[in-house]
């Protein structure tokens, strides 16, 4: 029962064991059951503590695994450490290897750059790519393949090698030679050595270059031909860059293969005759102007200075083999110097061109604002004879002609105002041998760019050749005085269509006037031109109290027009006559019209211009003109010869009062010779200071008759009693009146038809002098009109 009771428990506890127990035998089953029970009892704790048992076993396994893992980890860490060390060492070794490789490559690149001349000539060290590129170019140039194609199909377009060689030698003005660097033996020399050194080619072949140069230049030549690195000591002059380089790595570059050579040496000059036909023109000139080193003694060789320029090349060239009989055939690859020798003709002391050198004709000087020399060019010695120290500190005006000193001062003042613009002036400069030289000075100022102040004046002084034939220039602000021809006395109102008949009429009238050559030599720029006035101011006198040409304003106009005596101040205002109207046409008659409130006096007029004195007096001129113009009139009023004092500049100013009159009266007063007779109105008697008054002429139609008692100085000057007087002079009129003066009323006479016109050229010369003006009142009018007007 116990077994049976135990079995359910066992089956309940262990379901998997139930079928096994039920299927067992009885006998053995009891024993087995007891055994099973015992095993079951033994297993129960085991089953109760299954986890523990399993845990214990697991713990044991974990311990074993942990130990093994630790061992494995330790072993693995050792392996990893060893591998990391190996990798690190490998990386370090690789970096070291790369660094060594880079250092080697840099060293080779540096050495290559030292061997290539174009790399060393650069201002700074080039990069590696540039060094390699230049090295390739240099190697191509050494092999002679720099300008040829790789397939060898390149050929010159139209020149052969010989033609190209001759052109190069002629352009280089020298001869080509090739010498061995080791021995100095001449390998080749061109035929152009004959006109250069007067030596045939045969004298150079078979000899050495040391035999052809001066003995003192042998050592220098040996240094230039040497290719060893230690041959050159000291400093090197790089002719391409113009810099002096110290001894060092650059020396190896200069002495290696392919480096450039340029040196000067003295070479032997032969005595062979040169045929000018067989050589070119430059060679013939070279033969005559060879650069000798002084006089040559008999029996001594003659040396000349030769400039040699070339390169060190490999010999023999690539692809060329020397013949077996050549002494240098078995020595392997050698070097040679390929160079061109040229004469130093420009420094020849005995050249014939030196005697024909033109002396300098200009020098540059610097002055302060006052004109004192602060710098003088050395060419002043050949130009004016002075040393620079003789001119420094002195004023340029001191060396100027007295007549040109003011002109030079004005030019310096003007150039200061121009501020940088060039001003030229010509003056006479006293040279050291006390001769006057015409100098043209072009000057301009230099301004400080910061302070804008004038620092100094720079002058270029040029000695002018044939100065007597050149006109003397003036400043830009100097008044020009051209000498005009017979058209100078045309009034401004004259139209262009009236010019031809006007000139013909004036030429006819001037042919019968004595001394007419003097009338055409006056300057029209000094004549007062008529002024066009409009509005109510046309009838107002000017309020200026000082005449335009008064003596205190411009002394040049103090001497003015003697021997012209008429009321020519009564010109026509330009506003009253159109430009196309014929002036002073013959045959015009003017009706008699009274002229109220006007004072007309017989006066000698002195217009403010300078004119050459005619040979005859004005009275004789008037008499001859009147006799020629109307010989039928016979009434003769006599002029009383009197002595009259000369007028002053203030009396000239009395002519400037503006009195208004109509055009017909202005023109009519010049239509007949009687208008030049003495006339007066009540209240305005004629007066002549210190002399008797003119007798009145009652016959207005009479003409002037010739007088035999008149002298040349009879009517030289008269009092300037013109149309009116200035307002401040009106109160002084009683002082100038004469007690014996008579009053007459002038009646304008009617002109006879066909009566010729006289004194038109005088009227047109004077223009309208009834108004005095200046540039301040009429700013748009020029006081001195140009010749074209």
From Swiss-Prot:
The keyword Transferase does not apply. It is found in: Nucleus. Residues 112-168 are annotated as: Required for heterodimer formation with HIF1A. One of its GO terms (biological process) is positive regulation of erythrocyte differentiation. The keyword Cell membrane does not apply. Its main location: nucleus. Residues 424-467 form the PAC domain. There is a cross-link at residue 58 (Glycyl lysine isopeptide (Lys-Gly) (interchain with G-Cter in SUMO2)). Residues 672-696, 723-733, 743-756 have a biased composition (Low complexity). Required for activity of the AHR. Upon ligand binding, AHR translocates into the nucleus, where it heterodimerizes with ARNT and induces transcription by binding to xenobiotic response elements (XRE). Not required for the ligand-binding subunit to translocate from the cytosol to the nucleus after ligand binding. The complex initiates transcription of genes involved in the regulation of a variety of biological processes, including angiogenesis, hematopoiesis, drug and lipid metabolism, cell motility and immune modulation. PANTHER family: CIRCADIAN PROTEIN CLOCK/ARNT/BMAL/PAS. This is Aryl hydrocarbon receptor nuclear translocator. The gene is ARNT.
């Amino acid at each position: 029962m116990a077994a049976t009771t135990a079995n359910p428990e066992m089956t309940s506890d262990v379901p998997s064991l139930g079928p096994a127990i039920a299927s067992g035998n009885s006998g053995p089953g009891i024993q087995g059951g007891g055994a099973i029970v015992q095993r079951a009892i033994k297993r129960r704790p085991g089953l109760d503590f299954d986890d523990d048992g399993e845990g214990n076993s697991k713990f044991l396994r974990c311990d074993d695994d942990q130990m093994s893992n630790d061992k494995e980890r330790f072993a693995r860490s050792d392996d990893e450490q060893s591998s990391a060390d190996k990798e690190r060492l490998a990386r370090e070794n690789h970096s070291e290897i790369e660094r060594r490789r880079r250092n080697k490559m840099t060293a080779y690149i540096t050495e290559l750059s030292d061997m290539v001349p174009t790399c060393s000539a650069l201002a700074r060290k080039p990069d590696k790519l540039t060094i390699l590129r230049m090295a390739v170019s240099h190697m191509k140039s050494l092999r002679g393949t720099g300008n040829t194609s790789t397939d060898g199909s390149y050929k010159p377009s139209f020149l052969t090698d010989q033609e190209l060689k001759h052109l190069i030698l002629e352009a280089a003005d020298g001869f080509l030679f090739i010498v061995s660097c080791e021995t100095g033996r001449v390998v080749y020399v061109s035929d152009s050595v004959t006109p250069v050194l007067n030596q045939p080619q045969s004298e150079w072949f078979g000899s050495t270059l040391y035999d052809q140069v001066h003995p003192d230049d042998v050592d220098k030549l040996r240094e230039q031909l040497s290719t060893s690195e230690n041959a050159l000591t000291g400093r090197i002059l790089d002719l391409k860059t113009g810099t002096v380089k110290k001894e060092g790595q650059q020396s190896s570059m200069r002495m290696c293969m392919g480096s450039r050579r340029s040196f000067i040496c003295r070479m032997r000059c032969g005595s062979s005759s040169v045929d000018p036909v067989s050589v070119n023109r430059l060679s013939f000139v070279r033969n005559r102007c060879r650069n000798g080193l002084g006089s040559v003694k008999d029996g001594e060789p003659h040396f000349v200075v030769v400039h040699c320029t070339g390169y060190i090349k490999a010999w023999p060239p690539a692809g060329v083999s020397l013949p077996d009989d050549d002494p240098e055939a078995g020595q392997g690859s050698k070097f040679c110097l390929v160079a061109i020798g040229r004469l130093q003709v420009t420094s020849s002391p005995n050249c014939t061109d030196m005697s024909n050198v033109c002396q300098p004709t200009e020098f540059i000087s610097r002055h302060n604002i006052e004109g004192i020399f602060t710098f003088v060019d050395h060419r002043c010695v050949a130009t004016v004879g002075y040393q620079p120290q003789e001119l420094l500190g002195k004023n340029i005006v001191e060396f100027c002609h007295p007549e040109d000193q003011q002109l030079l001062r004005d030019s310096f003042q003007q150039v200061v105002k121009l501020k940088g613009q060039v001003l030229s002036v010509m003056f006479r400069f006293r040279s050291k041998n006390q001769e006057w030289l015409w100098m043209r000075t072009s000057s301009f100022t230099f301004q400080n760019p910061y302070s804008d102040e004038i620092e100094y004046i720079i002058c270029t002084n040029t000695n002018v050749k044939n100065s007597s034939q050149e006109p003397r220039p003036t400043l830009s602000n100097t008044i020009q005085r051209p000498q005009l021809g017979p058209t100078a006395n045309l009034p401004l109102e004259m139209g262009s269509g009236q010019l031809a008949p006007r000139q013909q009429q004036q030429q006819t009238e001037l042919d019968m006037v004595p001394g007419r050559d003097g009338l055409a030599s006056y300057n029209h720029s000094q004549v007062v031109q008529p002024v066009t006035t409009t509005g109510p101011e046309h009838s107002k006198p000017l309020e200026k109290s000082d005449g335009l040409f008064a003596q205190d304003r411009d002394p040049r106009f103090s001497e003015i027009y003697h021997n012209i005596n008429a009321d020519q101040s009564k010109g026509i205002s330009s506003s009253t006559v159109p430009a196309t109207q014929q002036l002073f046409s013959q045959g015009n008659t003017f009706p008699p019209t009274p002229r109220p409130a006007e004072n007309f006096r017989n006066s000698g007029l002195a217009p403010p211009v300078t004119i050459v004195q005619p040979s005859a007096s004005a009275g004789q001129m008037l008499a001859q003109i009147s006799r020629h113009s109307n010989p039928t009139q016979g009434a003769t009023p006599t002029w009383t010869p009197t002595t009259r004092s000369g007028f002053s500049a203030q009396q000239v100013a009395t002519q400037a009062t503006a009195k208004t009159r109509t055009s017909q009266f202005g023109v009519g007063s010049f239509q007949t010779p009687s208008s030049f007779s003495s006339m007066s109105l009540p209240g305005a008697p004629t007066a002549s200071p210190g002399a008797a008054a003119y007798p009145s002429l009652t016959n207005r139609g009479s003409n002037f008759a010739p007088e035999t008692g008149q002298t040349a100085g009879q009517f030289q000057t008269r009092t300037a009693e013109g149309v009116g007087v200035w307002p401040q002079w009106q109160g002084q009129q009683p002082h100038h009146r004469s007690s014996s003066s008579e009053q007459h009323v002038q009646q304008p006479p009617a002109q006879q038809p066909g009566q010729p016109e006289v004194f038109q050229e005088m009227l047109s010369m004077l223009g309208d002098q009834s108004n005095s003006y200046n540039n301040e009142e009429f700013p748009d009018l020029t006081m001195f009109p140009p010749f074209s007007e």
